């Protein structure tokens, strides 16, 4: 299966369009659409995700990191070194649910989502959608059901301790169900 994410943040699986997790949440009012977001915040998010991924892979040259995001990287390092330390097994994983026809890129497995901005109620819906992708792909249960899974990490711009929201399995299952309702509602509205 070939999963492609375009620059316009659209997913194509073997050439067919699949709804993306972030797009569905935006379209259903969980967060502002990309047209309403200052391009700097989109760029910042991309830079932070790349820097943290390279750090986790052990290949980051910190002299190349934009000083504007260094605090976020420091905050990520603090999270990684916390007790017990978080050890990612997979980084920036693209997945697809062929039954519900949606796709997304999971920041880390064990299931974790990295945020640079402020808390939004929709963040748990995003984590729930990723939980659903893990189930659909029948990955190792410890990667989404284990003690290190189901976290949203809000990095601190100044490099301080991040805020970590950890969720129970039942909370994330409920969020997954809510996401699937939003996905189906979106498709129903646009099928006429």
Model-derived features: where do they sit?
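Metal-dependent nuclease catalytic cores that hydrolyze phosphodiester bonds in DNA/RNA
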Residues: 1-103
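Nucleic-acid nuclease catalytic cores
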Residues: 93-191
């Amino acid at each position: 299966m070939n999963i492609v994410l375009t620059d316009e943040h659209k997913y194509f699986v073997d050439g067919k369009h699949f709804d993306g997790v972030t797009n569905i949440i935006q379209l259903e009012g969980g967060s502002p659409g990309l047209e309403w977001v200052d391009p700097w915040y989109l760029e910042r998010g991309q830079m932070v995700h790349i820097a943290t991924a390279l750090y986790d892979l052990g290949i980051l040259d910190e002299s190349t990191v934009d000083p504007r995001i260094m605090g976020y990287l420091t905050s990520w390092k603090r999270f990684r070194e916390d007790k017990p330390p978080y050890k990612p097994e997979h980084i920036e994983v693209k997945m697809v649910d062929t039954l519900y026809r949606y796709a997304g890129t999971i920041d880390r497995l064990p299931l974790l989502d990295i945020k640079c901005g402020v808390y939004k109620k929709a963040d748990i819906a995003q984590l729930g959608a990723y939980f659903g992708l893990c189930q659909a792909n029948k990955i190792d249960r410890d990667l989404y059901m284990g003690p290190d899974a189901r976290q949203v990490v809000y990095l601190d711009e100044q490099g301080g301790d991040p805020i970590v929201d950890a969720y129970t399995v039942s909370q994330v299952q409920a969020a997954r169900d809510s996401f699937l309702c939003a996905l189906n509602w979106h498709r129903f509205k646009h099928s006429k």
